[in-house]
């Protein structure tokens, strides 16, 4: 028979205990814990009812901190004290989540600026994009909006946000992430700076080609222009031509425009096929990306806080107390409510050394109870939280 040298306290004495006997006792204790947990949750629901009728906040950090201090003091070792604290932090978090659910079930909604609409107004609107005609932002705009729109371009992402904020444009089209180069950090920072809202997204495949003036050839090329990300995405192709000088440009379409204006057969641009057609350039090389699934996701930004009734993706950002476990606690609101988180990013908070703002995307609609529960918890327990948008999701081709 298998024995363990576990300490089993009976009448103050220690003795060798059979493993199965230990397991049986643990099972009895666990069953008692479940019974007491459900009893505690019932009392927690009574607390929620009181808070519903009085308007008292669910989270009471002073009460929880004092309670944890008392519980820790009841443990008989430092190891157990830490365990008690972790255990009851989770118990309290679950209790709060149940209270958030009850608030939603009782129809106690958090005030939000957002308004639901059957569909976004896309006709007879003005759209701004960063870059020039032929850029991937231009392609994203043409894919998302009908032909009957007014559009114009600006030099920078900030300029595009400013145009929408000032009311000169109804929407802006902005790149937010690329499948090979990652996020566009400037866009994340601007989303927190401007009170604008994500109302849609568009995925565009970045099919880079080498463009030159008509009649030129690859053998004549000495200089290649493009955006730094495009140059990085075509690194292996460029390494196969060590004699070429690479020059950074504001964007891919701007590099194509530059080659067209210079009219020099020794100069080429890495840009889209559409940019080549727009500027009358010849395709000298194809399939330049070393990653065949090179796609860019663009967001559609508006000054109006609206979402379509069939919207299925939510974007939020939040800041946290600089304390252990706070990020886990925030993400647990999505996990507990069965929400599928599709993305998480972080950006440094200006003026707060080593502190970060988090950006999270998850699937859902602002009308869904699970989403309301999660947002209620995030808003109550983060230092600050903002819903950036609720919009339709586009899958990659």
Predicted features, each with a name:
Residues 2-4, 10-397:
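Domain-level signature for soluble enzymes in the chorismate/prephenate branch of the shikimate pathway
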């Amino acid at each position: 028979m298998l024995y363990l040298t576990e300490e089993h306290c009976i009448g103050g004495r220690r003795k060798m205990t059979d493993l199965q006997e230990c397991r049986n006792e643990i099972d009895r204790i666990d069953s008692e814990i479940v019974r007491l947990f459900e009893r505690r949750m019932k009392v927690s629901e009574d607390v929620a009812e009181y808070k519903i009728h009085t308007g008292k906040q669910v989270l009471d950090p002073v009460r929880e901190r004092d309670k944890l201090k008392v519980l820790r003091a009841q443990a008989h070792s430092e190891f157990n004290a830490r365990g008690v604290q972790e255990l009851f932090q989770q118990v309290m978090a679950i209790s709060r989540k149940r209270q958030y659910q009850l608030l939603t079930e009782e129809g106690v909604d958090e005030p939000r600026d957002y308004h639901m609409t059957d569909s976004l107004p896309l006709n007879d609107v003005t759209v701004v994009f960063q870059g020039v005609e032929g850029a991937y932002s231009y392609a994203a705009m043409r894919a998302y909006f009908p032909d009957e729109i007014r559009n114009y371009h600006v030099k920078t992402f900030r300029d595009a946000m400013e145009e929408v904020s000032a009311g000169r444009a109804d929407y802006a089209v902005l790149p937010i992430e690329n499948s090979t180069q990652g996020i566009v950090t400037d866009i994340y920072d601007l989303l927190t700076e401007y009170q604008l809202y994500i109302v849609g997204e568009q995925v565009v495949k970045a099919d880079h080609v080498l463009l030159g003036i008509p009649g030129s050839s690859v053998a004549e090329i000495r200089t290649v222009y493009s955006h730094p990300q495009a140059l990085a995405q075509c690194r292996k192709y460029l390494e196969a031509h060590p004699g070429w000088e690479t020059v950074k440009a504001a964007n891919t379409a701007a590099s194509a425009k530059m080659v067209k204006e210079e009219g020099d057969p020794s100069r080429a641009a890495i840009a889209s096929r559409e940019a080549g057609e727009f500027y009358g350039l010849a395709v000298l090389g194809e399939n330049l990306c070393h990653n065949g699934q090179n796609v860019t996701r663009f967001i559609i930004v508006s000054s109006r806080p609206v979402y379509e009734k069939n919207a299925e993706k939510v974007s939020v950002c939040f800041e946290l107390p600089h304390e252990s476990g706070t990020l886990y606690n925030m993400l647990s609101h999505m996990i507990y409510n069965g929400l599928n988180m599709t993305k998480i990013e972080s950006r440094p908070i200006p003026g707060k050394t080593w502190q970060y703002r988090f950006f999270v995307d998850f699937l859902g609609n602002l009308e869904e109870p699970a989403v309301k529960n999660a947002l209620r918890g995030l808003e109550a327990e983060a230092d600050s939280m903002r819903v950036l948008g609720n919009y339709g999701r586009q899958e990659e081709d």
